[in-house]
């Protein structure tokens, strides 16, 4: 099975508290007839305490329409993309020319040539690098991207591939729109980038990981030491066991963009938590293919759509209270980063202590990546350590 070898994240240098951003928006919009009570209630309801922004806050007032916003997006997206991929390659000491596939995903700006093509002029990839730009999947593209790269590596098991996500949601803000959806969006979404290195199971890096896993398992078998069990956890990388796509018919108006002459206007319906609460049969069906139940999953990496969505997923799957607190913390500290969020959560997971193995009969640790987005749809990826 394909394996996730390493992850990296990058953020703009500009970080602001929610109070700072709300105050600036309130001051600008009150001149346009803003209902301050509604604004304050919605800004507080998203539970975000701070976010990274692509530009200094004062620069947003100078942007005049989609052309300015998209140009700013392209500049910062390339800077973050170059930084996060360079960091990823440095972590693994893997030369850029050994990467065979580069998949990029974004939904917050438009570029032709696309981001990964432009990055080939900044990073020493091979000229025959295969490139796949994703656009339109929105928030679920981080999980979907992992799934599609893993599908590719099953066909090319001796290769290495990178998934890049760059989302600069702040540059889609509609400055003249006082709708509830835009007010929520203005308080919910942040900016950032993430990259993930995956390899097929015949790649040298995968073999190194597998050898380390086997050696530590053998040591534990003969010594029975919990200390060595923890060492095994630290050395093993997750395998991408499988993926599942879920589509809810006749729901295209629930979430997405309304593409206007002023740019990308948020479409955000009230039905998102309702769809989130309907995930259980789909997740259970997916897990049953591997003889697993919900209680066998010890690592949940769920996209932070918003506090109501997180609560709906947790209750809908009948997960123990606080199971998704990692996601809540992410939302609180840096907001919803669209497709980048779940990859940032993956990075935090792989670089921190993992929960104990769940399920009395489980030998391995299982994790679930779960994201929802436009269409309305969801994407699941099952991980195995």
Language-model regions: role of each:
Residues 108, 121, 126-128, 133-154, ...:
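Claisen-condensing/thiolase-fold acyl-transfer catalytic domains that form or cleave C-C bonds
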Residues 111-117, 163-184, 242-259, 306-315, ...:
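Active-site-adjacent elements of ketosynthase-type condensing enzymes
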Residues 1-2, 96-100, 127-130, 155-161, ...:
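Short coil/turn connectors at secondary-structure junctions
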Residues 42, 46-125, 131, 136, ...:
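Conserved beta-ketoacyl condensing-enzyme motif
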Residues 84-99, 281-298, 317, 349-357:
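Phosphate/pyrophosphate-binding loops at sites that engage ATP/ADP/AMP, CoA/4′-phosphopantetheine
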Residues 68-72, 104, 131-134, 181-183, ...:
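A short glycine/serine-rich beta->alpha loop
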Residues 1-75, 160, 169, 175-277, ...:
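Condensing-enzyme catalytic core mediating Claisen C-C bond formation in acyl metabolism
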């Amino acid at each position: 099975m394909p394996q996730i070898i390493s992850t990296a994240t990058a953020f703009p240098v500009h970080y602001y508290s929610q109070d700072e951003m709300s105050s600036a928006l309130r001051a600008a919009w009150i001149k346009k007839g803003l209902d301050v009570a509604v604004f304050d209630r919605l800004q507080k309801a998203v539970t975000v305490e701070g976010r990274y922004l692509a530009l200094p806050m004062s620069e947003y007032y100078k942007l005049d329409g989609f052309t300015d916003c998209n140009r700013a997006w392209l500049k910062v997206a390339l800077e973050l993309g170059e930084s996060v991929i360079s960091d990823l390659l440095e972590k693994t000491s893997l030369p850029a020319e050994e990467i065979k596939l580069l998949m990029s995903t974004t939904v917050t700006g438009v570029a032709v040539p696309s981001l990964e093509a432009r990055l080939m002029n900044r990073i020493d990839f091979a000229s025959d690098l295969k490139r796949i730009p994703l656009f339109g999947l929105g928030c679920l593209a981080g999980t979907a991207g992992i799934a599609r790269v893993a599908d590719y590596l099953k066909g090319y098991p001796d290769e290495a591939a990178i998934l890049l996500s760059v989302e600069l949601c702040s540059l889609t803000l509609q400055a003249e729109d006082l709708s509830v959806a835009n007010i929520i969006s203005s308080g919910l979404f942040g900016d950032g980038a993430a990259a993930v290195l995956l390899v097929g199971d015949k790649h040298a890096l995968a073999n190194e990981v597998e050898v380390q896993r086997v050696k530590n398992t053998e040591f534990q078998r003969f010594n029975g030491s919990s200390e060595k069990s923890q060492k095994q956890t630290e050395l093993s990388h997750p395998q991408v066991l499988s993926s599942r796509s879920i589509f809810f018919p006749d729901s295209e108006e629930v979430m997405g963009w309304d593409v206007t002459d002023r740019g990308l206007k948020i479409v955000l319906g009230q039905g998102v938590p309702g769809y989130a609460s309907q995930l259980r049969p789909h997740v259970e069906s997916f897990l049953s293919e591997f003889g697993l139940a919900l209680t066998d999953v010890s690592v949940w990496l769920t996209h932070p759509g918003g506090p109501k969505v997180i609560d709906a997923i947790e209750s809908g799957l009948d997960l123990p209270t606080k199971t998704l607190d990692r996601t809540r913390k992410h939302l609180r500290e840096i907001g919803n980063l669209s497709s980048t969020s779940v990859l940032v959560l993956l990075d935090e997971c792989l670089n921190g202590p993992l929960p104990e193995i769940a399920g009395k009969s489980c030998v391995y640790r299982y994790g679930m990546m779960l994201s929802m987005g436009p269409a309305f749809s969801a994407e699941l990826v099952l991980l195995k350590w």
